[in-house]
């Protein structure tokens, strides 16, 4: 008899869990919002994600978490990696309602967003690369034209029946009543899903949205992998994490410094109004000699100010040249070893950098910007290559840490 009671309790518990899950997957009467993270690689996508999360909250719509878009060498089409591969979903719910795109499409889309009602949103007409598709009498978002646009929506078998141009509305919900305008023009009853061809957010991330980084927490897989690497591969003691951006595409991007007031993530060190100075080439592409000088200076400074927690090693993340040989040679007399992952994994690099005692990143890079925001959440110190300028550093009391 006791066994039967326990069995009934177990069945009731299972039913309760099923009921709870169904309730969580019930439709949101306030509507949904999603987008293709189709601009740039992870750093750019992360900036856009924070802005899109804030935008969804301002409109009071559930954010459908898009997969991350990746471009792999030798593959013609982008890869879509589920959001929760790299980051936990639950912490985001402390800020606002979210659901993964897979859960939405598998459990809710047929009822809430049937195929006959799928509308793509863009600011104004987006022209197709295939000229025959461009009809002056029928302007279109061409939401699936090109890579990664087509592969992204194809991942979930999404096609659009028409386009909606939302100009002159915009995404800055912090300095105007823009959210109310969106809600008035696109009520959830008529537009259950706002599906944007690109992220409804600015780049670089708005200052007001940087604080949302606290809700973006690494998945258990990456938390454990990063801790394992630190424990098994790095010598005991404090370590300095660095990000070197030096691939050929970056070399070309840095050529625009001379003609720009801002470039990519430069506001993270120069300020959104350039209140901490103007752009200069060394911020974007520091020389090998400058990198070594700054590393030695940082290590010596930590030894003087934190003698009980000296830096014992350097961990390098890079898109191209990790400079392992050069750095090992330069730092060997200081008793410092230099390390990298055996195989490239930019996400694991970030998870490891986030646990370093000190970090030096690239002011212009949105990848470094992700790391800077993550470290700010935990109160960890961060610095930038070439900032402040070496000549300014000698004549001012500006502290390197930001």
From Swiss-Prot:
Pathway: Protein modification; protein glycosylation. It is found in: Endoplasmic reticulum. Its EC number is 2.4.1.221. Disulfide bonds join 36-38, 122-141, 254-284, 269-363. The keyword Cell inner membrane does not apply. Keywords: Carbohydrate metabolism, Disulfide bond, Endoplasmic reticulum, Fucose metabolism, Glycoprotein, Glycosyltransferase, Notch signaling pathway, Signal, Transferase. One of its GO terms (molecular function) is peptide-O-fucosyltransferase activity. Substrate binds at residues 41-44, 243-245, 349, 366-367. GO terms for biological process: cell fate commitment; fucose metabolic process; Notch signaling pathway; positive regulation of endocytosis; positive regulation of Notch signaling pathway; protein O-linked fucosylation. It holds the Pfam family O-FucT. Belongs to the glycosyltransferase 65 family. Interacts with N (via its EGF domains); the interaction is required for the endocyctic transport of N. This is GDP-fucose protein O-fucosyltransferase 1. The gene is O-fut1.
């Amino acid at each position: 008899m006791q066994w039967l009671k326990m069995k009934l309790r177990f069945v009731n518990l299972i039913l309760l869990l099923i009921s709870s899950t169904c309730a969580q997957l019930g439709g949101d009467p306030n509507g949904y919002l999603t987008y293709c993270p189709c601009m740039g690689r992870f750093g750019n996508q992360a900036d856009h994600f924070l802005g899109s999360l804030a935008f969804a909250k301002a409109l009071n719509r559930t954010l459908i978490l898009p997969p991350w878009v990746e471009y792999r060498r030798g593959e013609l089409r982008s890869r879509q990696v589920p959001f929760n591969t790299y980051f936990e979903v639950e912490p985001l719910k402390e800020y606002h309602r979210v659901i993964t795109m897979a859960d939405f499409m598998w459990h809710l889309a047929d009822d809430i967003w049937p195929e006959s009602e799928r509308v793509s949103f863009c600011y104004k007409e987006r022209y197709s690369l295939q000229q025959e598709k461009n009809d002056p009498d029928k302007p279109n978002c061409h939401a699936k034209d090109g890579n990664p646009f087509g592969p992204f929506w194809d991942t979930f078998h999404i096609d659009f029946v028409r386009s909606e141009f939302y100009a002159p509305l915009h995404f800055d919900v912090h300095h105007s009543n823009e959210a109310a305008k969106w809600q008035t023009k696109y009520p959830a009853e008529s537009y259950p899903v706002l599906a944007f061809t690109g992220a409804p957010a600015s780049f670089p991330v708005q200052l007001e949205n940087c604080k949302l980084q606290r809700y973006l927490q690494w998945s258990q897989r990456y938390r454990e992998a990063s801790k394992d690497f630190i424990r098994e591969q790095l010598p005991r003691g404090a370590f300095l994490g660095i990000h070197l951006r030096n691939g050929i595409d970056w070399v070309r991007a840095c050529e625009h410094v001379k003609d720009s007031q801002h470039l990519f993530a430069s506001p993270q060190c120069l300020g959104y109004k350039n209140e901490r100075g103007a752009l200069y080439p060394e911020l974007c592409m520091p020389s090998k000699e400058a990198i070594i000088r700054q590393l030695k200076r940082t290590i010596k400074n930590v030894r003087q100010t934190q003698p009980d927690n000296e830096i014992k090693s350097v961990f390098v993340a890079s898109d191209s040249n990790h400079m392992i040989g050069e750095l090992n040679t330069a730092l060997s007399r200081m008793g410092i070893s230099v390390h990298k992952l055996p195989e490239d994994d930019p996400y694991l690099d970030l998870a490891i950098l986030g646990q370093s005692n000190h970090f030096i990143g690239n002011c212009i890079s949105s990848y470094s910007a992700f790391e800077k925001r993550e470290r700010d959440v935990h109160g960890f110190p961060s610095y930038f290559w070439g900032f402040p300028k070496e000549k300014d550093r000698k004549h001012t009391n500006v502290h390197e840490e930001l």
